[in-house]
Amino acid sequence: MAKAASANPCEGEILRAAERYKIPAGILYAVGLTETGNKGSLQPNALNIGGKPVFAKSRAEAIQLAEQADRDGVKLVDLGCMQINRRYHGNKFESLSAMLDPAKNVDYAARFLQQLHAQHMTWSMAVARYHAGPDNDPAQKRYVCRVIANLVATGFGQWTPNARQFCGG
């Protein structure tokens, strides 16, 4: 990630936010890869519109796509490096452009993940809740297993017997 961090604004911000909020960098990076990983790197202009990933070529295009989704009545739109959900978190940003700004997007995601960790006391539960609310156990389990797989694939962790059993592998 160090080499890629210099070229990818999301990855550089992940390193800064991990240090700022005392989050293991590998966990924050694996969450980002799970959210917007495309060809092995995080995407600052990524969106998820109604469950469909979209990789815009620019912030301007991403804004246009998000605005069109609003006009079309799409309720769930996730934006940026860490796929911040506009419906549930958009009021924490001054604009769509701010939500897509890698520094603001990653900082908010890291702060949110740290709050979840303080509430649930484990990184596994914090990661689970990052993706899905408390009443969606199947989605949480799938998500945590995808994050663990990315953590292992990037060299930040390894499969433990408990993780293998939990994820069914």
Predicted regions mapped to residue ranges:
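Catalytic glycan-binding domains that act on GlcNAc-containing polysaccharides
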Residues: 3-169
